[in-house]
Amino acid sequence: MAAPDLLTYQDLVDHLLRYSAGGGQDAVTTPIRAAIQTAYRDLLYGRNWNYYYAQYEVPLVAPYSTGTVVYDHAGGTYERMLTLSGGTWPTWAAYGKVIISGIIYDVESRKSNTELTLTENSNPGADVSSIAYSIYRTTYTMPSDYRGSFSPVLESSNSQLKYISPDQWNQLEIRERTASTPTFWTLLGDPNTYASMAIVVHPAVSTAERMRFIYQRAPRQLRYDGYGSERTGTVTISAAATAVTGTTTTFLTEHIGSVIRFGTTSDVPTGISGLNPYKEQQTIGTYTSATSIALSAAVTNAYSAVKYTISDPIDVYPGTINALIRGIEYQFAIMTRQKDVDSAYSLYKEAKIQAYESDNHIAEPRTAASLLRNNPGWTNPLGEDNT
C-alpha cells in the first residue's frame, strides 16, 4: 500500500516536543509517549468509528467421526488421553467437543494426529474400551483486533444468525446436540488464547459452511516512534525499486506495516511540518534480515546511504487527526500538571465534535434496529434513532 500522506507515531512525538519546547533528550524523560498512547485509546475506543469496520470470514467445519477411540483415564502417555484409531484428529480438535455414548466432553489439548486429552472436569472418569465417537466444533477465534460485531450471516443461505446470551447458548448446547444449520450465536472468551474473544454458534454445522460478519476492529498499535534503533545506520534503494539495504541497521519482523521515511546523507527525515521533511515514505511489506527489507510499493527516486526513520502509522481516518492532536496535548497537560488543562480539554472537546461530524459519511437515516455487539455483550445503536 502506498503511503504518501500518512501521519506517524514519530509525527506525534515531534509535535509534543515542539508543544513542550523540549529537545531530543526530553523524548525519553518526559511523558510524551504515555500521553500519545492514552489519547489514542481514549479517542479511538470511545466510539464505533466507521473507519474501523471490516469484514471477516469464518470457515465452519463439519463434525468428524471416522474410526474409533479408546479412553485412558490415568497412567498413559498423557492423563485423560483419548486415542483415535482409523482416523486423524482434525487440526481444530483443541476447540472441539467429543460425544461418547451420548455424553459431551471438552477437549483440553490436541497432542498429535491420534492423541488428544480431555479436561479435568469433563471426562468419562474411567477407562473406556474401543467405541464410536463424534467430535464437533462450535467455538471459533475472533480476529486479534476484534472489538465488536454485527450478527454473522451464513453464505449458503444468506441467513443471519440470532444473538443469544452465553447462558442461553449453554442451555441449548446441553439440550440439543444434533448438528444442523446454525441459528444462534454468542460471544465467549477464547478458551485457548489469552485476551481474545471467540464466536460460538448453535447448533454445530452438519456440513462445512462459511460465515461472514462485519466487525469493529481495533486500530494498529503504536510501538515504533522513529527514535533510537529506528533510525540507526543508513539505507540504500534504487529508483523504481522496493528492496531496501541497510548499513548497521536493526530491522525487525515487527517493522512490517510500519512506515520508512527517506532523508538525505546528512539529515534524518522529519514529517512535513519538521525542519527536514522526508523525501519519500513507504510502508514496509516484508522482512528478510536486520539489514534487508522490502517495501509494499516502489519508491520513485534512488537513495544511497541516506538517513531514515521507521515509525508506526497513525491508524485513523483523516477527519480524526485534529482531534487526536488536541487529545495528546490534553493528556500531556494532565501528566505534566500544566495550568492550562481546562483550555486544552475545551479544544479537545471541540475537535472531537468535528471528528464525529466527519465520521458521518452516509446521509441515510439509521435505526435502533442496527445493533452492534462487542466482547462484553452490550448493544449500541450505530447512530441517532430514527423516530
Task: Give names to the regions the model predicted.
Residues F251-L252:
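Short glycine/serine/proline-enriched coil/turn segments at secondary-structure junctions
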Residues M1-M81, S85-S238, I256-T387:
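Glycine-enriched, solvent-exposed interface loops adjoining structured elements
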